[in-house]
Swiss-Prot record:
Reactions that this protein is recorded to catalyse: alpha-D-glucosamine 1-phosphate = D-glucosamine 6-phosphate
Cofactor(s) named in the record: Mg(2+)
Keywords: Isomerase, Magnesium, Metal-binding, Phosphoprotein
Organism in which the protein naturally occurs: Mesorhizobium japonicum (strain LMG 29417 / CECT 9101 / MAFF 303099)
Catalytic residues identified in the record: 102 (phosphoserine intermediate)
Name of the protein in question: Phosphoglucosamine mutase
Cofactor annotation remark: Binds 1 Mg(2+) ion per subunit.
Amino acid sequence: MAGNYFGTDGIRGRANKFPMTAEIAMRVGMAAGLSFQRGSHRHRVVLGKDTRLSGYMIENAMVAGLCAAGMDVFLLGPIPTPAVAMLVRSLRADIGVMISASHNPYYDNGIKLFGPDGYKLSDEIEERIESMLDKDVELTLADSDGLGRAKRVDGVHDRYIEFAKRTLPRSMSLSGLRIVVDCANGAAYKVAPEALWELGAEVVAINIEPNGFNINKECGSTHPAGLQKKVHEVRADIGIALDGDADRVVIVDENGAIVDGDQIMAMIAESWHQSGRLAGGGVVSTVMSNLGLERFLGDMKLQLHRTKVGDRYVVEHMRAHGLNVGGEQSGHIVLSDFSTTGDGLVSALQVLACIKRQGRPVSELSKKFEPVPQLLKNVRIAGGKPLEEAPVKAAIEDARNRLGKAGRLVIRPSGTEPLIRVMAEGDDPQLVEAVVNDIVEVISETRSAA
């Protein structure tokens, strides 16, 4: 079973295939449990999942491994990833586990791990756990009288709803707003509509009937067309699209236009900067964020800090440099005044707060900058390392020279899927399209020749 298990966001893959098998899930439970046993107290784990069919298999395998390591497991059921991060702290647990493949289709699944502070594990801790997966950890498991127990915990949805509501001022009501929320048939199908309704909004909820197979299927933050249509149909003020585990959000304005993570960060950063709440003199995002965001922040004398892709790296940079707004273009928004990880619902509430404070529609509030022409294409690969091939290296170097200082080029393997992502941006859209197509063509030819 030797191999790399962890990617940019935990362990992820096709359910019941390496590395997302019941056996490996059990061993991850054992290794994680042994890694976080400190002190003589009873050790606790909170374990949540989204709505995939394979969640039952992975959940039970994880419980077996964690209990074998002497950990008591609190089962949360289907619940958003940020709720797991919050409940790790609230329930004084040693570890948090979320079983989800986020925005991926139902046939994938994954395991995300959180430390006792509610933050995703560092690369170093993941490497330590990974190193144990291929070893005989059974030698260090709990004695028969020290095994863990598993129990279902009631009221966790209400805890998270109250947490989300508290991120808005108590005096603020969403009364007068008609909101369409697309829950992607995922983990937030109960909590998101309820939280918005309790805050006073008129709520139209769609994709709230998970069946194990329809999570993210033509819905949610990666497929917002249905939400756009519904916003038009009911004449809503705003549409909110979450993904399968509700750690990312995409907004649709009253005209049906999409507002991505870059524009959401710009909106929140400007509002917090004006109120004196923005910390650290800037915002943290990744290499994928649009150059327009960087220029917009620069006009306010704010800095855009860039990290490699993955909200975990955004959070690590935020913590290291004292910033409280960060995120990704894809819609992972991290507001560290409230959360330790991306939280789609909480981020949407901050957008709604901007609407209520300023009394202006989303279409006006979200047009903070004109995006620089940007094109992203994915090339599916069967294996190997095409980026190390000489023709691909030459094509990339040529593209950088053609773009010069007027643009950016980002080429990277996906950390969650067998893809090479090719992104370019610059003020000349024809040049951007040309360099992306040239690189994609060379990678495809290299892949075919392999």
